[in-house]
Amino acid sequence: MRKVINFLKKLNNSINYVNKLNNELSINNDYYIPRMLVENRILLKKNTQQKLNVVLIAFEPETWLMFQSIYETFSKSEKINMTVFVIPYAHSTLPEGVYKDDGLREYLDSIDVPYIYGYNEKTNTWLDLFQLRPDYVFYQAPYNGMYPETLKSGYVSRFAQICFIPYATILMKGKIEETVYPIDFFKDSTYLFIENDINKNIITEYFSIKDTLFLEKKIIVTGSTKIENVYTLINDTSLEKNIFTILWLPRWNTREGMCTFFDYYDILLAYVQEHENVRLIFRPHPLTFQNFIHTGEMTLAEVSRVKETFSTQNLILDENPDYVTAFNTANVLVADPTSLIYEFFATQKPIIYTRKIDILNAFGAELEKGCYSVTNAEELKNCLDNLVLKNDRLAKTRSYIIQRYFDKNEKASEQILDILTH
């Protein structure tokens, strides 16, 4: 009798689940049905050996490296039609309705990557991505606020599967997670390709806090497409024997409490002036000057003076889209919290982390063990003095971290291609 009762309970639960699912499908037909049709279309194309259409939506030269190996690997595949879709972008530091062209077309021209420009400047109209009949779409950034309606994830996911790869490896915790892990975009995505298990755990924990743990099943650990490229580009041939080069990467805004640009600007200038064999390369984030002008922390005249100051042999302003060139030239990185700390680790060179608040997540804390953390000008100068003299006590620690979290044979793009074509 008990078995019969248990069976009836299970049957009732199953019926309730089916009824609930049918109800959801009825209520959310506009959400579920288009996505089911997309999935079936892709499956049919795979089974009939038709080429899959892949689109990379891109707008910024500085983070193109995330796409470089995807572009190269996918373009070689006989199963893929590859399109690079270049656009201008919106941002909170720009007036509403204004879209900025960041020069990606010129950069792609310089490296012989063909593209389609998705915006008609004369008519102020956008090319509808649907016209390209994409099967898979990769975004350079997962922020719907940067895109017009015809490129937002909610619309695009009705006719294509969205693939997320990080434009930056997130090393920070707290409020910033609200920005860098956009739930609306992740809900519309089919695949979330993540660098490593520790970052998967961080994102999963965030999903749990946001009551969206169902998104975890979308996560696939593939390695980093950026690290895959960095390893092919780093070398020591650019190092000069008699010059010690500091690469400085301060954060682009002060509202987060992490930026040390104004704290160490004069300190680093003075250090270079006091040491004739020391060079400083200042590499501002693409939004740095735009943001400081927007917030009133700098004027146009002050920005011009900074650029003029960094125009000498030993004070260099680096706005080259290819930041790995600066990696190769530098003897040490001095940086606020930034994903480039993670990428610079691949060079095996020392890193000075300019710590201001407790902001690093679990992965950032692991990397910090191999960094020289400084909290004031005196500590920064002492640390630089030691490194100029080649006193690098954390070299072995960095080697251990590299062995644990980095792979010189990183093939993230090949893994992603295999997942999407099988």
Regions found by a protein language model. Give the residues of each.
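Membrane-proximal basic amphipathic "stem/tether" segments
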Residues: M1-T48
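Conserved catalytic-core segment of nucleotide-activated headgroup transferases in glycan assembly
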Residues: L65-I70, I219, S224-E302, V374, ...
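Active-site and donor-binding regions of nucleotide-sugar-utilizing enzymes
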Residues: V55-N229
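Nucleotide-activated donor-binding/catalytic signature segment of Leloir-type glycosyltransferases, i.e.
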Residues: G296-E319
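C-terminal amphipathic helix plus adjacent low-complexity
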Residues: A377-E378, N382-H422
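Nucleotide-activated donor-dependent transferases that construct or modify glycoconjugates
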Residues: I33-P61, P142, L247-P250
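A donor-sugar binding/catalytic signature common to diverse glycosyltransferases
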Residues: C163-F164, E319-A362
